[in-house]
Amino acid sequence: MRVADFTFELPDSLIARHPLAERRGSRLLTLDGPTGALAHRQFTDLLEHLRPGDLMVFNNTRVIPARLFGQKASGGKLEILVERVLDSHRVLAHVRSSKSPKPGSKILIDGGGEAEMLARHDTLFELGFAEEVLPLLDRVGHMPLPPYIDRPDEGADRERYQTVYAQRLGAVAAPTAGLHFDQPLLEAIAAKGVETAFVTLHVGAGTFQPVRVERIEDHHMHHEWLEVGQDVVDAVAACRARGGRVVAVGTTSVRSLESAARDGVLKPFSGDTDIFIYPGRPFHVVDALVTNFHLPESTLLMLVSAFAGYPETMAAYRAAVENGYRFFSYGDAMFITRNPAPTAPKDLAPEETV
């Protein structure tokens, strides 16, 4: 399967660089999996597509202000993007500078603070901080807006690039499908008889990395930490018993649930995942999906294509562009029910469709 099969033309004007005034103000493109039918709605119309007895699964990770600016002791400027907090004083980070810092070198953080380069692990740098990392990031860190939001972060991003139900610190990118939900909408969902459950997947900066191979099968996913608790397993079982659907809010919730059910049975799981879902891969847990619009040739677009079917997904994206939907993290959303017989690009080998 070719990565190029997942490209589409996107006018720059459709990239959402700022959030709307209200979280729930986005548009919603619905895609019916069994028929491929599309409908243009508002995000608050999501309520009409949910049924009593359904279970919505959210990712409760919390974005940390993971971007730091500073300079080396030699005076050279650099930028740090924390990828993972290892403990109270150490992180793994991407470092951008004219020359990479060497082990033992000191880094002075803008706004106050100091770090030491401890070791290099492939493309990541292990950094040690004199003070505790999370309070330091909260004090002088910047929200790690995605590269396609090509502007400096603003004070408002600390609130809006965060879900209202975010709890567990550790993400360096938001689970963006959740950004559309405000507290009144969550209350309305509960009032309809829809249950909720929460997984945790700390989204890493690797989510924005382009696929650099020509064929999908040659791509290796980055690792991210996740946790699916026994409470989620029990909630899914109860949902199945009452005939409800499991509705994942965001691709990170999908990847969490499907990682915990790789052998076909959902079990509690805590640890790293590198699951790569693309056309031909089965889904064991998720029946419906709320998701934003994703980048061309991205692994997230491939996941949606696996869920809804390749031709149906690409047709939906063409319709979204034609109708002026806003794309990416601060953009509009889709509600998709799973296609029971999804098809893939034409050159998918038969053995890969099972």
From Swiss-Prot:
Belongs to the QueA family. GO terms for molecular function: S-adenosylmethionine:tRNA ribosyltransferase-isomerase activity. Its EC number is 2.4.99.17. This is S-adenosylmethionine:tRNA ribosyltransferase-isomerase. Transfers and isomerizes the ribose moiety from AdoMet to the 7-aminomethyl group of 7-deazaguanine (preQ1-tRNA) to give epoxyqueuosine (oQ-tRNA). It comes from the Bacteria. Keywords: Cytoplasm, Queuosine biosynthesis, S-adenosyl-L-methionine, Transferase. Gene3D superfamilies: QueA-like (3.40.1780.10). The gene is queA. PANTHER family: S-ADENOSYLMETHIONINE:TRNA RIBOSYLTRANSFERASE-ISOMERASE (PTHR30307:SF0). One of its GO terms (biological process) is tRNA wobble guanine modification. InterPro entries: QueA (IPR003699), QueA_dom1 (IPR042118), QueA_dom2 (IPR042119), QueA_sf (IPR036100). The keyword Metal-binding does not apply. GO terms for cellular component: cytoplasm. It catalyses: 7-aminomethyl-7-carbaguanosine(34) in tRNA + S-adenosyl-L-methionine = epoxyqueuosine(34) in tRNA + adenine + L-methionine + 2 H(+). Pathway: tRNA modification; tRNA-queuosine biosynthesis. It holds the Pfam family Queuosine_synth. Monomer. It is found in: Cytoplasm.
